[in-house]
From Swiss-Prot:
Cofactor(s) the protein needs: Zn(2+)
GO CC terms: cell envelope Sec protein transport complex; cytosol; plasma membrane
Lineage: Bacteria, Pseudomonadati, Pseudomonadota, Gammaproteobacteria, Pasteurellales
UniProt cross-references to InterPro entries, sorted A to Z: Helicase_ATP-bd (IPR014001), Helicase_C-like (IPR001650), P-loop_NTPase (IPR027417), SEC_C_motif (IPR004027), SecA (IPR000185), SecA_CS (IPR020937), SecA_DEAD (IPR011115), SecA_motor_DEAD (IPR014018)
Membrane disposition: Peripheral membrane protein
Biased segments, Basic residues type: 888-901
Function summary: Part of the Sec protein translocase complex. Interacts with the SecYEG preprotein conducting channel. Has a central role in coupling the hydrolysis of ATP to the transfer of proteins into and across the cell membrane, serving both as a receptor for the preprotein-SecB complex and as an ATP-driven molecular motor driving the stepwise translocation of polypeptide chains across the membrane.
Keyword check for Transmembrane helix: no
Cofactor note: May bind 1 zinc ion per subunit.
Family per record: Belongs to the SecA family.
Protein name listed in UniProt: Protein translocase subunit SecA
Subunit structure and binding partners: Monomer and homodimer. Part of the essential Sec protein translocation apparatus which comprises SecA, SecYEG and auxiliary proteins SecDF-YajC and YidC.
Length: 901
């Protein structure tokens, strides 16, 4: 600690000192607000809105607004905000993250900034990690907000468009992070402004902010459409992979391995060795999937390479019951950070299809990206962003670097007395499990509840089997049993209760010591007051037993890659000053040790075990683990930062496209834009054949005539003009062509009317923009996947990506203009009279065909009249005119239909 820090305190301490002065001010107001009637308290909301309209700022009315919410909460919810919750609320009104320990009342704290900022009328979004928490928090706080005249909405998956609009129109909207992101993308795929859901992105308060902005940062939100189906190739390649042999180290000049592939467990990537490439190519040639003499890495075989690498990753890097589960014939992803299943989500780049082939389930079609955005870039769209969590301080640097959010650690209301014991290390997993079971037995005997945290479904099931063998009754909470989550968490605080859980362990819900009597009461049908009192009495008795036993005991079965996830597990115990304890049991076979500790360090630690089953407990161990976790966190931070740098390039382009789309949706008349585009397009085409400031001998007039005819349907005798008029030069010729194009377009507009033409222009522009943007996204994906190869040419891949993507984007915009003008110029406008004539002719044709027993072609139109003839007694020749009167040969008209039938 520096001398300055000792004198002035840390940055966090200085911030808290400043905020405590505001708390004193709010507390002094409490008696005056207690004296207000309900109506007077409710009237404060309109008073604050009027004062904001009059020029006051949110910070000026903050003390009174917080005092209003505190008093309303006492009357409506029966809960009074603690001073530390007021501090948390003030932190959240700024661009800050409040780190509040588990059980400190984050849900109630959130009511303070939400009420204050909702007074502006721009809408407030409270973001949660799942729909259960969104519904729960909204229903908990709804009575308070409605008492104060604020409307509350809930936006979760499965709502109708009307329900969504109603939710977004509310003053305060509770929503899941994924639904907010997808709605943003849907809004930017809408074809009318009425179809959009979201209004201005004003203020987002993100609950469990570390989970959403850190853990989910690498997960892009993608809306996709179906692309081509290639399940046969996935099935074929799937048969190849089991024959490939893993090589432990990559080839070097000194070491030439004999394996077929190497694995990078940190980045979850697989690479073929030269031997592996030859083996794969021989197999593909033998199967007839690749011609002899060709290479897997040739440009024409990129699809095959894509399938092989996806299958290799699926078999070697993604484990069943760790990374995914198989449920109802589908592959369901398991979130590595929370342990929850993510229904509806699919891995990209063919990985999901490769895993479906591996597990023998139905292979669904690959998808083509229609719209995408990362959580990092979505949440940076908000004018104000804040967040709260129990574990943010370890990621404070990243929050500041990426989002510009300062982290403030809020003190607990009561001192934390949990006993965090030192980690113990074992030589292998079996010895570790034996020690864990002994610890659990000890707790059960003393009637202390135990929560055992595992890092995967697979490990939770292994430990469950070991406990069954030991005769210890327990519950398992993992991705396979997530439906029972609320029930299992409610029982986890009972005396002697043993709960095995993955990282999902009731995040967002508290484990109450002695059990949750309210959850028990909810199971009863119309419980009587007598039954409720009995449940309360039973809870008080159990609560006392658990408190004497030492509170909730946490056992970690291995360290997670992130310290934050470990702290979350520990944070389930010791809430609001309750007693509790925690300990992590580790082995040299754990993933963290295996991947991030080199062989030398592991061998050194292995030598420290002299007796079988011996536990190692030392300060050196803590340093080794801290070092390994720091490496992982730095690795993942670099990955997220790298992803953001690439996504920022696409983000700038996304902004430009979505801005253009919103302009189109908000304006019914875009004729000025169309006129400007038409001018640009025709001048661009003319420049290609009549270069500026060139001699007439250099002009390609024939080429220009053909181009104007083919692409724009304009038959212009430019050669004749030049012969007839010697004074016609480059500029005047250009003006004449553009004038004729504009004149012909105006004539079309006069035929159908301005309104109809404006509607058509808007539709063509939107449809073309969406189609080209979709193709551009696919091109950007391909560019991103291969850009790292530029590094071999001593070029910076990021700079190359920026240059290439800018060039592609410019080309897309030019293509957009060209396609729009080409469509609008070539389209043939039909008058009402022509349409009526065509309909009459169609009816006459139908009558003739019915008389001759020929199938009707609804799409053919005719204006010819021909004598009706009875063809029933003779065969119609293939080259004879079709009797329908279309003028086509029979084989090209109804003859082809008859042949098909």
């Amino acid at each position: 600690m520096s001398i300055l820090t000792r004198i002035f305190g840390s940055r966090n301490e200085r911030v808290l000192r400043k905020l405590k002065k505001q708390v004193v001010k709010i507390n002094k107001m409490e008696p005056a607000f207690e004296a207000l009637s309900d109506d007077e308290l409710k009237a404060k909301t309109q008073e604050f809105r009027d004062r904001l309209s009059g020029g006051e700022t949110l910070q000026q009315i903050l003390p009174e607004a917080f005092a209003t919410v505190r008093e309303a909460s006492k009357r409506v919810l029966g809960m009074r905000h603690f001073d530390v919750q007021l501090i948390g609320g003030m932190v959240l009104t700024n661009r800050c993250i409040a780190e509040m320990r588990t059980g400190e009342g984050k849900t109630l704290t959130a009511t303070l900034p939400c009420y204050l900022i909702a007074l502006e009328g721009k809408g407030v979004h409270v973001v949660t990690v799942n729909d259960y928490l969104a519904r729960r928090d909204a229903e908990t706080n709804r009575p308070l907000f409605e008492f104060l005249g604020m409307s509350v909405g809930v936006n979760i998956p499965g709502l109708s468009p009307e329900e969504k609009r109603e939710a977004y129109a509310a003053d305060i909207t509770y929503a899941t992070n994924s639904e907010l992101g997808f709605d943003y993308l849907r809004d930017n795929l809408a074809h009318s402004k009425e179809e959009r859901f979201q209004r201005t992105l004003g203020y987002a308060l993100v609950d469990e902010v570390d989970s959403i902005l850190i853990d989910e940062a690498r997960t892009p939100l993608i809306i996709s459409g179906q692309a081509e189906k290639s399940s046969e190739l996935y099935i074929a390649v799937n048969k190849l992979i089991p024959s490939l042999i893993k090589q432990e180290k990559e080839d070097t000049e000194e070491y030439q391995g004999e394996g077929d592939f190497t694995l990078d467990l940190k980045s979850k990537q697989a690479h073929l060795t030269e031997r592996g490439q030859e083996k794969v190519e021989d197999w593909l040639i033998a199967q007839g999937l690749m011609p002899e003499g060709d290479s897997l890495y040739s440009p024409s075989r990129i699809v095959l390479l894509h399938h092989v690498m996806a299958a290799l990753r699926a078999h070697t890097l993604f484990e069943k019951d760790v990374d995914y589960i198989v449920k109802d014939g589908e592959i369901v992803i398991v979130d590595e950070h929370t342990g929850r299943t993510m229904a509806g989500r699919r891995w990209s780049d063919g990985l999901h299809q490769a895993i479906e082939a591996k597990e023998g389930v139905d292979i669904k079609s690959e998808n083509q990206t229609v719209a995408s955005i990362s959580y990092q870039n979505y949440f940076r769209l908000y004018e104000r962003l804040a967040g709260m969590t129990g574990t943010a301080d370890t990621e404070a640097f990243e929050f500041q670097q990426i989002y510009g959010l300062e982290t403030v650690v809020i003190p607990t209301n009561r001192p934390m007395i949990r006993d965090d014991r030192t980690d113990v290390m074992f030589e292998n997993e079996q010895y570790k499990f034996n020690a864990i079971i002994e610890d659990i037995k000890d707790c059960v005997e003393r009637q202390q509840p135990v929560l055992v945290g595992t890092i995967s479904v697979e490990k939770s099931e292994e430990l469950s089997k070991a406990l069954d063998k030991a005769g210890i009754k327990h519950n398992v909470l993992n991705a396979k049993f997530h439906q029972q989550e609320a029930e299992i968490v409610a029982e986890a605080g009972f005396p002697s209760a043993v709960t095995i859980a993955t990282n999902m362990a009731g995040r967002g819900t508290d484990i109450i010591l002695g059990g949750n009597w309210k959850a028990q009461a909810a199971k009863l049908e119309n419980p009587t007051q007598e039954q409720i009192e009995a449940l309360k009495a039973e809870w008080e008795k159990n609560h006392e037993i658990v408190m004497k036993a030492g509170g909730l005991h946490i056992i970690g079965t291995e360290r997670h890659e992130s310290r934050r996830i470990d702290n979350q597990l520990r944070g389930r115990s010791g809430r609001q000053g309750d007693p509790g304890s925690s300990r992590f049991y580790l082995s040299l076979e754990d993933g963290l040790m295996r991947i991030y500790l080199n062989e030398g360090k592991r061998n050194l630690m292995r030598k420290a075990f002299t007796v079988a089953g011996e536990a190692m407990e030392s300060k050196m161990l803590a340093k080794v683990i801290a070092s390994a976790q720091a490496k992982v966190e730095a690795f993942h931070f670099d990955g997220r930062k790298n992803l953001l740098e690439y996504d920022d390039v696409a983000n700038d382009q996304r902004h430009a496209i979505y801005e253009q789309r919103n302009y189109l949706l908000d304006n019914d008349d875009i004729s000025e834009t169309i006129n400007a585009i038409r001018h640009d397009v025709f001048n661009g085409v003319i420049d290609q054949y009549i270069p500026p400031q060139s001699l007439e001998e250099q002009w390609d007039i024939k080429g220009l005539e053909e181009r104007l005819s083919q692409e724009f349907g304009m038959e212009l005798p430019i050669s004749n003009w030049l012969e007839e008029d010697n004074n016609l030069h480059e500029e005047s010729l250009r003006e004449r062509i553009v004038e004729i194009a504009e004149k012909e377009y105006k004539e079309k507009e006069a035929l159908v009317g301005e309104d109809a033409m404006h509607h058509f222009e808007k539709g063509v522009m939107l449809q073309t923009l969406d189609e080209l943007w979709k193709e551009h996204l696919a091109s950007m994906d391909y560019l991103r996947q291969g850009i790292h190869l530029r590094g071999y040419a001593q070029k910076d891949p990021k700079q190359e990506y920026k240059k290439e993507s800018f060039r592609m984007f410019t080309e897309m915009l030019d293509s957009l203009k060209h396609h729009v003008i080409m469509t609008l110029t070539r389209v043939r406008v039909r008058t009402q009279e022509e349409m009526e004539e065509a309909e009459l002719a169609r009816q006459e044709m139908a009558t003739r065909i019915n008389q001759n027993n020929l199938p009707v072609d609804e799409n053919s139109q005719t204006t010819q009249n021909s004598e009706t003839e009875d063809y029933s007694d003779r065969r119609i020749g293939r080259n004879e005119p079709c009797p329908c009167g279309s003028g086509k040969k029979y084989k090209h008209c109804h003859g082809s239909r008859v042949a098909r039938q």
